[in-house]
Design a protein with these regions (language model features):
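Intracellular helix-loop hinge segments at the cytoplasmic ends of transmembrane helices
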Residues: 27, 183-189
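Transmembrane alpha-helical cores of Major Facilitator Superfamily
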Residues: 12, 105-109, 137, 200-208
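Multi-pass alpha-helical transporter architecture, strongest
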Residues: 147-150, 236-275
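Helix-to-loop junctions at the C-terminal end of transmembrane segments
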Residues: 63-71, 114-127, 221
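A membrane-interface helix-boundary motif in multi-pass transporters
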Residues: 219-247
Length: 275
């Protein structure tokens, strides 16, 4: 059906704007943020702080996930407060380490917390197609922020890191909108007898994008940085705009999907749990 092919295109566009970007994200941060060298013999330059950050990441992920399943309000919000405190602590440690790797590692933490919320919302309230549109809008906003806003903070250590953290967290949230809303939509678009083949076809199409766009990012990066030999001085504006264009294409297809859903009564905006 046309709905299935639209969902497949949305999948490849959204994932191609995120997964290939992850391969270049650390270097992009190195090019757009100002870091100072941390003494190797200090606490922030030691290997111990890396292990502590790993533990904090697991703590944040666990508490954010558990928050969704707590019944008592007091306990629920206490767990949420612990998760937020852990996230802030992790971000502070990433800043003190002056490490682009530590900063980008925050990417999945918000997604861990909100994906169950989004999945539960789709089950009980629906609006899967609208979530895909929202995810595309967030995707566009994040890549344009990386392209045009973040470079303006170069030289401002605190401001640049704050913008980077917020944008990375929102990008993670946009990423979580895709699996929470897209994958549950597939059974509504194909016959149950071929659901396995449908998922396989989507993954096949998706992998074409995951193969192609890392190459394109590298080609565009080389073409727009001729003569630049310092890897921390590259200009990422053009590749980021290209990724934002994927978000624009996904947004357009998302609106088309909503129109097709309304005309053909595909049920994408309806809850999965029908009373």
């Amino acid at each position: 059906s046309s709905g299935f092919w639209l969902v497949s295109l949305l999948c490849v566009l959204c994932y191609s704007a995120i997964f290939p970007f992850q391969k270049y994200a650390v270097n992009m941060l190195q090019c757009n943020l100002t870091f100072t060298e941390v003494p190797a013999d200090s606490f922030w330059g030691s290997q111990s702080v890396t292990y502590i950050q790993y533990v904090i990441m697991l703590f944040v992920a666990a508490t954010a996930f558990l928050f969704n399943f707590m019944k008592q309000k007091a306990v629920k919000f206490f767990v949420l407060a612990l998760s937020i405190a852990g996230l802030v602590t992790y971000c502070y440690m990433g800043y003190m380490r002056q490490s682009a790797e530590s900063i980008f590692a925050v990417f999945p933490l918000l997604a861990v917390g909100i994906t169950p919320v989004l999945g539960n919302y789709v089950d009980h309230k629906g609006k899967a197609a609208s979530m895909l549109v929202l995810g595309s809008i967030l995707l566009i906003a994040c890549h344009l922020t990386f392209a045009f806003v973040l470079p303006e903070f170069k030289g401002n250590q605190v401001g640049g890191v704050i913008v980077a953290y917020l944008t990375i967290l929102v990008l993670g949230a946009s990423f979580s909108l895709v699996p929470a809303s897209l994958w549950p939509s597939v059974p509504k678009l194909v016959d149950a007898k071929v659901i396995g083949s449908a998922y396989a076809l989507i993954f096949w199409i998706q992998n074409i994008g995951l193969w192609l766009f890392p190459l394109l990012i590298g080609k565009v990066l080389n073409a727009t940085n001729e003569g630049v030999t310092d890897a921390t001085q590259l200009n990422y504006t053009a590749p980021l705009v290209m990724l934002a264009c994927l978000g624009v294409a996904a947004l357009f297809i998302g609106f088309v999907l909503k129109i097709v859903d309304k005309k053909k009564n595909l049920g994408l905006e309806l809850p999965n749990i029908q009373e």
